[in-house]
Amino acid sequence: THFAVALKYTAGQASAPEVIAMGRGQIALQIIERAKNAKITTLRIPILARALYYTSDIGGEIAEGLYNAVAVILAYVFRIESGESIEMPELTLPQEFRFDENGNIDEGRF
């Protein structure tokens, strides 16, 4: 199952990134397609997408426990959009944010 979460963050204007769209399955694929058509950077990070999906609301800020992971990814996006060629950083999420595709805490691989 695909998950997609679109975030918006304007430094200095918001205290945390805001969820502007999210979905799973066919809706997730539509979100990804629209982002690509709008030339918005998309990344496939299933563990983070599931964490955001299961702990966020559209129009709301992300959960405080995900601030670090999202900050790492936003910094990465800003760098690649400025032309740097760097590898995507590895993410570590707190255990309570590691969900499987059904919304259960995933005690496995992470």
Would you name each region that the model predicts?
Residues 1-110:
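Divalent-cation
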